[in-house]
């Protein structure tokens, strides 16, 4: 199967800023919201291209959007695909401004 090349910024949408992702950054793992149709190889190549680091592992997870109540009835939050990226030892990505 041939991977379709997409621009890196179309694959990596934004970093996840939370207490859990901040704690994982101490272990060299960084969490990003990615395009729903992106695969692990594309995510790895995009991170290496954008941040100039060596990626050793990529874990992905799909988060279903929650049902929310609105004034007029019920709605849904957007589904998200997240990637937890592990970088090589001694390298880091500065997404928290440290």
From Swiss-Prot:
Keywords: Ribonucleoprotein, Ribosomal protein, RNA-binding, rRNA-binding. It comes from the Bacteria. InterPro entries: Nucleotide-bd_a/b_plait_sf, Ribosomal_uL23-like, Ribosomal_uL23/eL15/eS24_sf. One of its GO terms (biological process) is translation. GO terms for molecular function: rRNA binding; structural constituent of ribosome. Pfam families: Ribosomal_L23 (PF00276). One of its GO terms (cellular component) is ribosome. Belongs to the universal ribosomal protein uL23 family. NCBIfam families: PRK05738.1-3, PRK05738.2-4, PRK05738.2-5. One of the early assembly proteins it binds 23S rRNA. One of the proteins that surrounds the polypeptide exit tunnel on the outside of the ribosome. Forms the main docking site for trigger factor binding to the ribosome. Part of the 50S ribosomal subunit. Contacts protein L29, and trigger factor when it is bound to the ribosome. This is Large ribosomal subunit protein uL23. It comes from Bifidobacterium animalis subsp. lactis (strain AD011).
């Amino acid at each position: 199967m041939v991977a379709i090349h997409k621009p890196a910024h179309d694959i990596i949408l934004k970093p996840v800023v939370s207490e859990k992702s901040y704690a994982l950054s101490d272990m060299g793992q960084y969490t990003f919201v990615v395009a729903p149709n992106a695969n692990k190889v594309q995510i790895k190549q995009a991170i290496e291209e954008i941040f100039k680091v060596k990626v050793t592992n990529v874990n992905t997870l799909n988060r279903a959007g929650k049902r929310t109540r609105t004034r007029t009835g019920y709605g849904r939050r957007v589904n998200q695909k997240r990637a937890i990226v592990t970088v090589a030892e001694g390298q880091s990505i500065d997404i928290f401004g440290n």
